[in-house]
Regions:
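C-terminal end-of-chain micro-motif
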Residues: 1, 212-213
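Acidic/His-rich, divalent-metal-binding segments that scaffold phosphate/diphosphate chemistry
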Residues: 1-103
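Generic structural signal of hydrophobic/aromatic residues within well-ordered alpha-helices
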Residues: 7, 11, 24-25, 37, ...
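Charge-dense, low-complexity intrinsically disordered segments
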Residues: 55, 59, 107-110, 191
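Divalent metal-dependent catalytic cores for phosphoryl transfer on phosphate-bearing substrates
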Residues: 71-184
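Acidic, carboxylate-rich catalytic segments that either coordinate divalent cations
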Residues: 166-171, 182-211
Length: 213
């Protein structure tokens, strides 16, 4: 029987030490871990989950996740808690397989952030007894879409609740990696995404200070 906590330790080591953790996870994928052993099968589902070609030219959710993890590894020392940050990068789209739909030819995954919070808890609970760690990772997953919602003034924005549960800087850093971890990234696109992150921080701070949404 596989020692899940040992696998957790291996994952943790690669997430915190590798320059490109995706190489390790791609090896684990080829060896079948993500198709055979729960809860790792939750990651295997990402391979089968398509995304909008317009927003994700890199392809399925697994490809995107691997690109985000590598981006996160580049930025992890900027995080106040690299362990929580890197696990959130790995699990941030765990909710997409169950929320992805094709409507009128458009692929959507509404509320994958909310479901992702719950699935992150389910994923990590068999692997570690550190409940505060599990909760912290899950909350970062929960709020990783707020950059889009806040910058575009969407009704899903909820800055006050977000700031009660996570640090703004951590959400911004994860969002940056999420936005940059995509195919066909150009200098112009990267500059635009970084500007969006700055706007997110500024607008969130203004909302918090002014007592509005």
């Amino acid at each position: 029987m596989m020692d899940l906590k040992q696998v957790f330790g291996d994952f943790n080591q690669h997430l915190l030490q590798d320059e490109t953790p995706s190489r390790y996870f791609e090896t684990m994928l080829r060896q079948g871990l993500f198709y055979k052993v729960y809860p790792f099968t939750m990651l295997g589902e990402l391979v089968k989950t398509p995304q909008s070609v317009q927003h994700h030219p890199e392809g399925n959710v697994w490809n995107h996740t691997m690109m985000v993890v590598d981006r996160a590894a580049y930025h992890r020392e900027e995080s106040g808690n690299p362990g929580i940050f890197m696990w959130a990068a790995l699990l941030h789209d765990l909710g997409k397989p169950d929320t992805t739909q094709t409507r009128k030819g458009k692929i959507t995954s509404y509320d994958h952030d909310k479901l992702g919070e719950k699935l992150t808890v389910k994923f990590l609970t068999p692997l570690t007894e550190d409940k505060s760690f599990i909760e912290a990772v899950a909350k970062l997953v929960r709020w990783h879409m707020q950059t889009l919602f806040v910058v575009k003034d969407m009704p899903f924005a909820d800055v006050h609740t977000m700031l009660q549960q996570v640090k703004l800087e951590e959400v911004a850093l994860l969002s940056l990696c999420d936005r940059l971890g995509r195919g066909k990234m150009t200098v112009e696109k990267e500059t635009s995404e970084r500007e969006n992150i700055k706007q997110f921080i500024q607008k969130s701070q203004a909302i918090a200070n002014n007592g509005i949404r």
